[in-house]
Every structure is written in structure tokens, then in C-alpha cells.
Amino acid sequence: MSRHPFPRRLAAVVLGTTLVVAAAACGSGDDADAADGTVTLRFSYFTSEQNPIAQTWKQWMEEVTERSDGSIEFEQYWDGTLLGADEVVEGLVDGRADIAQVTPTFYPGRFALTAVNELPFGTNNVGAIASAMSTLVEEDEDLAEEWSSQDLVPLAWNVGGSSAIASNREIATAADFRGLKVRGLDRGSRALDANGANVIALAPTELYGSMDRGLIDAVYGVQFGALPSLKLEEISDYVVDASTGAQTASTLAMGQAAWDSLTDEQRAVIEEVSADAPSMYEAANRAAEEAACTAFAESGTELSVLAGAEVEKLRAAGQDVVVDGWLAEVEEAGHDGAAFRETYDAAVEAAAADFPDGDESGVARCLAKG
């Protein structure tokens, strides 16, 4: 059973599932299944199917089924009904799911190199980041080993857009973060912590209730277009883009055993569709941002972008703390973090040419519409 040499030109999105041979219509058992050649993959995703990432995965699955002439089908589980966000890696390896979105933020220390895209105050260009990660997981041996050593096959990358902080308190300056109870998980939230915020780790499914009951004042780490999928426009008085840059890169992945169980033809179809994933996600994300813009306008929520001088204050207090912590983690894993970051930055810069207008945030685009 050979290791998967990660697919050529993998894409920018994410999914999850458990490999099951589909039962034949006449139900005559294993012989009929083998003759039919159809597989049903259990797909798992830990939040709503209404957000732009989920919409991308739905389109991805439809395309895989169509292009495989029905030889690959999917049994879909949404809202964490099969695997929670922190259960995906083990669930893919032990076969509870065949394909699922792996979000490294939920696995501290296990994806140290991958977490380079969590370093704050970088680009908002999610397409460029996703494309760069697709390239690097093929070309960089250390990054590839980070995934293959855990029996995971990354297929398509997705990157959360620049975080729009939904809040019940106005945030107009860096000082406004002091004492603010903010939901946060990734390294960008640690920059807020360094500026005096009280960062609280909560799963997406806990956000509405926690904010509604006053357990938190604000939500960080959810892209602008996905906020309405959590109904946060109903309970947020303000949404501010703090210009911390794009968030965590996640990947649609399969366990190695499930991947090896597919035929060469089926794997080729998955690779082909994954190569189209960045454009799928770009379209879904822009549509979701437009819908979010409308939803927040209708709810009367005040949108803003933090002034550049205030962003610099956030950066001065938080960036070095976060970067130094990441470098130490990467060194502990046996890698040269500074060298890898240079490689990553160069890959993102090269990929940005294919996404020329990708650095403007969803909040900024919404405000520009007037």
C-alpha cells in the first residue's frame, strides 16, 4: 500500500468522510458491491452547511459524483453530527469518516508548519494563501511529512477570510480590547490577548448562546461571510475588521487507508475537482459576503474598519509575541521556522498574481458599497 504523493495542484477548500462500499440496488452483498464499483464516502463537517466553506464542499461533492459518472457518492453529516471539530483527525484515521475538513487550530502542536498562515497582520488574500499551501504541501518535504506522518491526505485548501469581529461593544481603538471577553482560537486571537482582551476558546456551535447570555462580548475568528450562518447579525451591535489578516488554513482531507481504497480513476477525479476548488470557494465566499452585507444592513449593525494607527498599536503589542511562540513551536518540532516562513511568504506572493483583488476584506467591500 503506497503512500499518496500529494495530488498535483491541490486546491483551496475542505471536506470530511468514512469509506463505505455502496450497497447494490438488488442487495446481493459483497459480490454485487465489487461488481458495481461504486463507493459511498462519509463526509463530515463540524458547522452549518449554510456557510461559504460548506457551500464549496457541497459543490465539490456534486462535481466529484458527476465527473466520476456516479462511482463516488457521499453520505453527508453536518453540524458536527458525525465528528466534532477536535475529533476529525482521529475520525479519519480510524474510519468513522472518510473525508472531512481538518482545521489545525483545533490540534495545538500537531500542525506546526501549517500554522504559519495563522500569523497575524498578513494578507487577506485567501485565494493566494490556499494556492500557496497547495503548492507547498507538494513541494516542501517537511510540510508533506507533517500530514503523511498522521496518515492524512490533504486534498484541497480553504482559508478563512479576514476576521470580522462581531461585538456588543464598540471597538474603535486598540485600547477598546482591554477587558473585552472575546471568543478566539487561532494565533491571531493571541495578538488580541496581548492587547488586553480576555480570549475564551469556544466552538462555533457555542457562539450564539454565549454571546446572547453575555458570557462573551465579541466573536473573533469567523469570516465576515459566515457570521450570518451562525445568526450573529441578530445579536451583534457592531462588526469591526481589525485588519489582522486571513485566518487559519484548513484542508479537506482523507485518511490514508480510505484514499488507498479508491481506484486510480477515482483518485484522479478527486484531484481534478480539487484543482477547481479555489475558484469554487472564491465565488461562494464573495456571494456569502454580499449576503452578509445585506443581513447586517437590515439588522442595523454598525460596520467599521479599524484605523491604520490603531492596527499598528495592535501589531506592536501582539505580533512579535505570536511569531516568537510559533517559531519556538516549529523549532521544537525539528524545523527551521524562519526559513519556512520565507518559503511560505514567497509562495503567497507568487500566487497573488492569480487573485489580483483578493486583499480587500469583506467588511471593507461592504462599506464601499455605501
Positions of PLM-derived features:
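N-terminal secretory/targeting leader peptides
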Residues: 2-8, 13-17, 21, 26-128, ...
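A gly/proline- and charged-residue-enriched helix-loop-helix capping module
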Residues: 124-144
